[in-house]
């Protein structure tokens, strides 16, 4: 399982929810396994680029007109996790070419890892708009009885394998 997103994106497959049912918010904690392509760089070995790791996934189904607001909410949740740990971080809006084909918008939250000479992603938040809903036939019945596709969003919790080195490095004392 590379991420819980695939399973969470199918919860309402072939269903029609009402406006009152939305938003639906899910959190999932799963072990993840990935074969990381292009992960052979010397600065991304060890804990920072593991093939097996645990991850919390945030997932949300929402009304199309609430999609941007829900996206900002997920970004804020991820940023608050990083702020709570006192990290130096930045939030980066990915260019369209760097987003997966299914995502309309993605922000990466990156923390400073001085020994790696820069920032590394610890969370990613994306808005698929109606892409996943169309593929899964997940719709919402509006108050006027019309039916349209809902929007889906997801975000990863902190990548613990990258948080640990940053915790050590950003909290070192001279003694």
Describe these PLM feature segments.
Residues 1-175:
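TRNA-recognition modules of translation machinery and tRNA-sensing kinases, especially anticodon-binding
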